[in-house]
């Protein structure tokens, strides 16, 4: 799709007789530029053009002619100034929600549901009318429409601020670019709508089948793959993933009549009339008994739905009652999610095989007849180690019971002994590495795990380490996936992960993966080199994670990076100094110290340093040290912070993120399900903050938070 020809500017001017004011010209240019960009998006990202190339060329020529006649209209991001699909990339900038995007409280038993309904009845003095809808196991998305046109799509984030994923949202089939009002439901000037993005089970299975056919590892489950697909930097990848969306709520509305709906059910009718997707399985019911019937029904028919569900959401339907009931800092009081228990199924254990991980750990896994469970097909499950296999008492050939804990992770519970026919056989852990032949042994006496000690050259450990370097929790290098790791090692382009940051175009041309049929470097190869260059500036904690030091994940790495500030300082620290860091302890400290005693480990660090990888963090002077000297304990789940993020925020402001409550504790921050630390704080009289109080404490220090 390209055009360089121009039209006679006089012809353009002749068409502007009724629209020649400056504002009119700007409006005309904006409408035409938007239309061109829309068709470019359909062509380059969605691969689904709706006009011919000739029609597009004519449209682009009209825009070029308009800009030539009125150069002041031309902007740097005009379609005439960009090549092809340039500009269609998602950079995940912060996007503030117009209205807070709350979470939901969960209940897991009929008694807990009844207690919630009783609180509602006590508050309103009667049985409420409820709206029951399926709880889709997907990822939340907020859309903003202004004057009927899609303006922005954003993830939930911390409820106040999410990530801008507008380009990716536009690729979802169910997300309309433009809404159409009706006589019954006129469009508000601004509409913020919330929904769930998901994979239909059939689409998820097709996606995984395609990945397996390409020699790539399949996704674990539909929810995680939906979240990953929505967060792709290249929206064209998202477009190929066949994501779907269902709307289940409203945020901010700007309308002459205020919030124009009496019930949530009416709001859903309006959304559907405007062209937005809503669930066909929503039901209005009155009283707890009717709610319980809906929950029981969908518990039995959950696999009759095209997508995965993990419960039923129950909402008070009348908007006036919703406002009366209000919300906590994290969830509305007028809604609750009834979560179904994890599912179990029986299947045949065909074999037990082993996998060698990046730190040499040899893990047995169950290879089973595929079985449907929790809406997806399961054929593999971990067995952790040889001792666990013996403890569970499973034999190869057994019929076994498997469960998806939390409807996500497959787990072998044990055998159905009564179904044994004598053909079953015991699994024996290998004595030598299946990849390199080295004799296996525990890292130390008493360990349940056995490991391959050939950490430097074992092919399995090498490719897992190279792949790990690129992971989201490490350097986060797009383009360096499992297939790329194998290709680079097999072509001997790299000997280990230490060579990654000195890769050149000539190096990549030695692999088929990054070479075109014409013998040139592929687009993926160029992208990999660019992303490797960017990764050199990643913060220190990511470098630590990428080194594959045993026990050092993002939590410990952040703690060490925050405490010491540079890799040299970490190497120079004693084991006791490392262990004293909050969140580290003696086991991790010993692992870090031991790792740096190995010559080839230090060589990897030296190679990265020589290639320009950042080995020290610059302290952010813009963050005020509002918590200097304060010991703060975080307990329970926070909506806006992961546990690591909360600790990082405390440490960055000069505080200590303590793991236990004592008389020296300045504050305890209590989220959802806080546990014994909350009780200890009450017993000792330590001030307790909710999440809003914690946020004020971070911003202003100890003088202003309210518990």
UniProtKB/Swiss-Prot annotation:
Matching PROSITE patterns: BRCT, DNA_LIGASE_N1, DNA_LIGASE_N2
Pfam families reported for this sequence: BRCT, DNA_ligase_aden, DNA_ligase_OB, DNA_ligase_ZBD, HHH_2, Nlig-Ia
E.C. no: 6.5.1.2
Residues spanning the membrane: none
CC terms in the record's Gene Ontology section: cytosol
Keywords: DNA damage, DNA repair, DNA replication, Ligase, Magnesium, Manganese, Metal-binding, NAD, Zinc
Protein name: DNA ligase
